[in-house]
Swiss-Prot record:
This is Pheromone-binding protein Gp-9. GO terms for cellular component: extracellular space. Homodimer. It is found in: Secreted. Disulfide bonds join C37-C77, C73-C129, C118-C138. It comes from Solenopsis saevissima (Fire ant).
Length: 153
């Protein structure tokens, strides 16, 4: 079975690297535990937010709180199955290690700084589902800004 390296940061990086092409793609849909986590939380692919919705912040205005929470639960499920979260607690070191491995980011890279800032911003949240969605949204938004600034350079 192929190794499943999934966490919110990989979602974000995949989204950022090809944002225009992948903006309609559902967050996490390319990963092995996606379908399992959808089933565990009683959702379908149609219920999951697109990368574009989350990176732009539209998910907050276009959806009800229950939809936000359920999407967060799917994300948390995938993070937990990959050993990156336990309940509402991050394994920050493992998240960084996996992120660096997947992205090739080097120390001082703004993407790592964004990841660290997003983890710090959400670390005290107690609800594991809301925390997971906010983390993903934070990283996606930061990566979108970084991608835009790099295009203008």
């Amino acid at each position: 079975m192929k190794t499943f390296v999934l966490h919110i940061f990989i979602f974000a990086l995949v989204a950022f690297a090809s944002a225009s092409r992948d903006s309609a793609k559902k967050i996490g849909s390319q990963y092995d535990n996606y379908e399992t986590c959808l089933t565990e939380h009683g959702l379908t692919d149609d219920d999951v937010f697109s990368i574009g919705e989350v990176s732009s912040g539209q998910h907050k205005t276009n959806h009800e709180d229950t939809e936000l929470h359920k999407n967060g639960c799917v994300l948390q499920c995938m993070l937990e199955k990959d050993g990156l979260m336990s309940g509402a607690d991050y394994d920050e070191e493992k998240m960084r290690e996996d992120y660096i491995k997947e992205t090739g980011a080097q120390p001082g890279d703004q993407r790592i700084e964004a990841l660290n800032a997003c983890m710090h911003e959400t670390t005290d949240m107690e609800d594991k589902c809301d925390k997971s969605l906010l983390l993903v949204a934070c990283v996606l938004a930061a990566e979108a800004v970084l991608a835009d600034s790099n295009e203008g350079a």
